[in-house]
Swiss-Prot record:
GO terms for cellular component: cytoplasm; nucleus. It is found in: Cytoplasm; Nucleus. It comes from Candida dubliniensis (strain CD36 / ATCC MYA-646 / CBS 7987 / NCPF 3949 / NRRL Y-17841) (Yeast). The lineage of its organism: Eukaryota, Fungi, Dikarya, Ascomycota, Saccharomycotina. Coiled coil: none annotated. Belongs to the eIF-2B alpha/beta/delta subunits family. MtnA subfamily. This is Methylthioribose-1-phosphate isomerase. The active site is at D281. HAMAP family: Salvage_MtnA (MF_01678). The gene is MRI1. Pathway: Amino-acid biosynthesis; L-methionine biosynthesis via salvage pathway; L-methionine from S-methyl-5-thio-alpha-D-ribose 1-phosphate: step 1/6. Catalyzes the interconversion of methylthioribose-1-phosphate (MTR-1-P) into methylthioribulose-1-phosphate (MTRu-1-P). InterPro entries: IF-2B-related, IF-M1Pi, IF_2B-like_C, Initiation_fac_2B_a/b/d, M1Pi_N, NagB/RpiA_transferase-like.
Length: 424
């Protein structure tokens, strides 16, 4: 797939002309189309429709949309300008576009905090605009810098872990959803760690006795962010990967971990899965983590393999015990802005539920035999009128998480009581 660097730029903000565009991720990987965001209402719709997604990216788009809207206020006469109270109402409205992702609420609440020095009846002025502009720019710049730190810290954790395990040879990493440049200001969180690790631990340049051989992104039903977006980024970076369905995880890990009878998926793809790295939309005080639906399932599978040294495999003649890899680290990667210390446990996280048609239909372009892209079609795949449960996220209990990697050099791990200490 030929591409350019701007293809992976999910958010384009013109700092001089105060214009915001976002990459319409519903059209990827077949079309690269940017859409303008000219108001808070535009941002609400784009976030709700998932034209932009990923907790950090949502927060940045939300903040920049406020800048654009306030900039537009300043072009009006004083008598037509909105008040601080009007703006606060708009911020509350925008927060509801994606209630599970704490980054958006944090960013907009920060802006509301800036507004507290003004009276509700004050009209929007240049001073207010400048404060919001400075905040949004800092949010973007800090996110990009922090993502690179997350990548570096995750790489160090991986090297230390494999060294302590005395592991040698090739290994693989599994991930879910999309946590790369398309979900952030750039580089990414979980996918950022994968990028940094592959850059440092390729077979030909690794200074260690191990190297990153392969990535397994999960398809991530029902919205298919893994299939559409993560594969798009990995392909662009030329990082070796194989796409799998969400229900292939256990079988794949078992196949790659069978030291006595490894069955390669393809040539050179026999390295065991040593890490499952995921992003986060909200991490609460005890470490429980809300992330894309299917994340809890991955942590449960990793826990099973870590606690079962042998799996019974039935052959035609007898039953044999197969030794399996029992050291899969489950890593959550996210900026510290994703940590919500006001929520104690995952039971208190509000989980967004998506429309039923996202599960009962598939949407995509028609492809001819040559691979050329045609019109966008919606295809039914389920019995019409059936009951559907479609949560966008699930909550992974902290007990199933090995580490939380942020921009802080100190990687959060659990104490002797099995508890995280995330107090900043």
């Amino acid at each position: 797939m030929s591409t350019t660097t701007r293809t992976l730029q999910a958010i384009k903000f013109d700092r001089n002309n105060i214009k915001l565009e976002i990459l319409d991720q519903l059209l990827l990987p077949y079309s690269t189309t940017y859409i303008p965001i000219t108001s808070i209402e535009d941002a609400f719709k784009a976030i709700k429709l998932m034209q932009v997604r990923g907790a950090p990216a949502i927060a940045i788009v939300g903040a920049f949309s406020v800048v654009v809207e306030v900039s537009n206020y300043l072009k009006q006469s004083d008598s037509n300008r909105k008040t601080i109270e009007n703006l606060n109402d708009s911020l509350d409205y925008l927060i509801t576009s994606r209630p599970t992702a704490v980054n958006l609420a944090n960013a907009l609440n920060d802006i509301k905090q800036l507004l507290q020095e003004f009276n509700d009846t004050d009209i929007i002025n240049e001073k207010i605009y400048q404060q919001i502009y400075d905040y949004a720019i800092a949010l973007y710049d800090e996110d990009l810098a922090n993502n690179k730190k997350i990548g570096e810290n995750g790489l160090k954790y991986i090297i230390n872990t494999l060294t302590e395990q005395n592991f040698k040879g090739p290994f693989s990493i599994m991930t879910i959803c999309n946590t790369g440049s398309l979900a952030t200001s750039g580089h990414g969180t979980a996918l950022g760690i994968i990028r940094s690790t592959y850059q440092a631990l390729q077979k030909n340049n690794s200074k260690e006795e191990f190297w990153l051989d392969h990535i397994y992104p999960c398809e991530t039903r029902p919205y298919n962010q893994g299939a559409k977006l993560t594969t798009y980024e990995l392909d662009y970076e030329q990082i070796p990967f194989t796409l799998i369905c969400d229900n292939m995880v256990s079988s794949l890990i078992n196949t790659l971990s069978d030291d006595d009878n490894k069955k390669p998926i393809k040539t050179n793809q026999i390295s065991p899965v040593k890490f499952i790295i995921v992003g986060a939309d909200r991490i609460v005080e005890n470490g429980d983590t809300a992330n894309k639906i299917g994340t809890f399932q991955l942590s449960t599978i990793a826990n099973f393999f870590n606690n079962n040294k042998f799996i019974q495999q039935q052959s035609k003649s007898n039953t044999t015990k197969t030794t399996i890899n029992k050291e899969i680290k489950f890593i959550v990667a996210a900026p510290k802005t994703t940590i919500d210390l006001n929520t104690k446990t995952g039971d208190d996280i509000v989980i967004e539920e998506r429309p039923a048609n996202e599960l009962t239909t598939l949407v995509g372009p028609l492809l001819n035999e040559a691979g050329d892209v045609g019109e966008k079609l919606t295809v039914g795949i389920a019995t019409p009128g059936i009951s559907v449960w479609n949560p966008a996220f699930d909550v992974t209990p902290h007990e199933l998480i090995d580490s939380i990697v942020t921009e802080d050099p100190h990687v959060f791990t659990k104490d002797e009581n099995g508890e995280f200490n995330l107090i900043k």
